Design a protein with these regions (language model features):
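Conserved alpha/beta-hydrolase
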Residues: 60-77
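Alpha/beta-hydrolase
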Residues: 157-159, 163-250, 257
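The serine-hydrolase catalytic nucleophile loop
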Residues: 44-57
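Conserved hydrolase catalytic core segment
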Residues: 108-151
Length: 314
């Protein structure tokens, strides 16, 4: 679904000083005074500002919210030094600072819109910011890496066996078994998952890569795009050990605000999690969980209608 681009009353890109780091945000809205929403990108290492146009075409969040698109520490057109100063705990602390900045600017509580690892970061950050956060929308959250890795490993082995092609068998053998603690293995798995239609429905890895590169060039320019690609691998190399140990089911964050979990039925990365059980484990009163048909890991792009409706009532 593509939405006609709306005229924006607010559209500004700012550099914020966040815990000793310069980080960029783009703030967009169709009218002043709308409630704030912060988008927390998937990762690790994946920037967000190059996807603003895609978010606006698919989700049109600016109709109802002042949307804060945030490039996390070390991501996008950041220095090489910034990409070496990352950790899961640091990204959580940085998000809490962005929440405080947004709440102070708007004098309203913030809705967090997290994706994949960004959803996990949002959950952890919200646990310490209940006075500033009104709710969390957790799209395809990373909840327990060990279980997710095992489910994906089984999924890939079954798909490769069914395909019966030597090329895929070689790719799976080169990938090896989890955990994946280096950027190259993490990226190899992403290629297989994308081409098996588990990330964004109907999009191959090469199609998403082209989309990524075009978006980066438009947003960061040639030199900035080279930095963004370099930073992606650097941040992954620094953070994958933290991600491998992530387990929010055994150690749930203490949240008093509602969480709205959204999963795609075709998402191998979250297939291990029983969405119906989550409201009793993570989240305050009003927490919900839904698994959406005809959607992969990027459920917000595959089924923007469902995600929009959740955001409107969150």
């Amino acid at each position: 679904m593509t939405i006609k681009k709306r005229a924006l009353a607010i559209d500004e890109t700012l550099a914020l000083d966040i815990n000793g780091s310069r980080q960029q945000v783009r703030v967009c809205a169709t009218a002043p005074g709308l409630p704030p929403l912060i988008v927390v990108q998937q990762g690790p290492g994946i920037p967000l500002l190059h996807e603003v146009a895609k978010f606006q075409r698919r989700l049109d969040l600016e109709r109802d919210f002042l949307v804060v698109y945030w490039d996390q520490r070390g991501c996008g057109n950041a220095s090489a030094a910034e990409a070496l100063r990352v950790s899961l705990a640091q990204q959580v602390a940085d998000l809490q600072a962005v929440i405080a900045w947004t709440a102070d600017r708007t004098q309203q509580r913030v809705l967090l819109f997290g994706i994949s690892l960004g959803a996990a970061i949002a959950l952890l950050a919200a646990a310490g910011e209940s006075t500033r956060v009104r709710a969390v929308i957790a799209n395809s959250p990373d909840l327990q890496t060990r279980a997710a890795d095992a489910a994906v490993d089984a999924f890939l082995r079954e798909r490769v066996r069914s395909a019966g092609t030597p090329r895929l068998a070689r790719a799976l053998a080169k990938l090896g078994s989890p955990p994946y603690l280096d950027a190259r293995s993490f990226q190899r798995r992403a290629v297989l998952l994308t081409d098996f239609d588990s990330i964004e429905r109907g999009k191959t890895f090469n199609a998403l890569l082209r989309e990524l590169l075009v978006g980066m060039l438009k947003t960061y320019g040639i030199v900035g795009s080279v930095r963004a690609l370099r930073n992606m691998s650097a941040v992954q190399s620094r953070m994958l050990t933290d991600v491998a140990a992530l387990d929010l089911l055994s150690h749930p964050p203490a949240l008093s605000v509602p969480v709205h979990f959204v999963f795609g039925e075709q998402d191998a990365l979250t297939a291990a999690f029983m969405s119906g059980e989550l409201p009793g484990v993570i989240g305050g009163p009003g927490t919900t969980a839904v698994r959406v048909p005809e959607a992969g890991h990027l459920v917000h792009f595959d089924r923007p209608d469902v995600v929009q409706a959740i955001a409107e009532t969150a």
